[in-house]
């Protein structure tokens, strides 16, 4: 049986404007919550497993977005930010002047027992590539695979956007004994991959996202 552990949803609610946080709490559906969408000039919405609903009838203002940004800190080069020691992710949409005009606040969850479907592949010792559309659980499976493999092997996680190990300098407990290397510039992730091999003697490397030719070459 799967055991779902949700990173304290209150940590995410606390960075949102009060009226939006209150609407989420009142809806009492946080177990099903996937994302909160905040776009300038539009009403805020919540995306659940069965669809999208409006949270309030008030349109999002610059002040609303500024409030959230101030509470989460700076965005990385890929316009993503997080909440320390959680798996939640906030992605920004910016205008041509670099000002935030939209936010996608994704709920991060650690789910134990998700690797059963590929357990034989994980234990084979061969390289594995997971493909699929966004939001179907690729990172969740990678996180759990890293935890399981780290019980017996030296595992390094190259964490493209801090989604496997969470935001902050201390990795989330869901990765177990696996060590985590953060990627300061996504365009240079291949260098972090090579550094992991050369400096830290891993038996297994887990990479969250591979989307560039240099990264594919480094993975070989």
Question: Which role fits each region the language model picked out?
Answer:
Residues 149-198:
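P-loop NTPase switch/communication element
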Residues 107, 118-163:
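P-loop NTPase nucleotide-binding module
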Residues 1-86:
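N-terminal accessory targeting/assembly segments
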Residues 89, 117, 141, 188-195, ...:
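Well-ordered alpha-helical segments embedded in enzymatic catalytic cores
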Residues 56, 68-128, 168:
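P-loop NTP-binding catalytic core
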Residues 36, 90, 159:
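Residue-level signature of catalytic and energy-coupling elements of molecular machines
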Residues 201-202, 206-220:
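Conserved P-loop NTPase nucleotide-binding/switch module
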Residues 41, 133-135, 160-163, 185-188, ...:
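Short, ordered loop/turn segments at secondary-structure junctions
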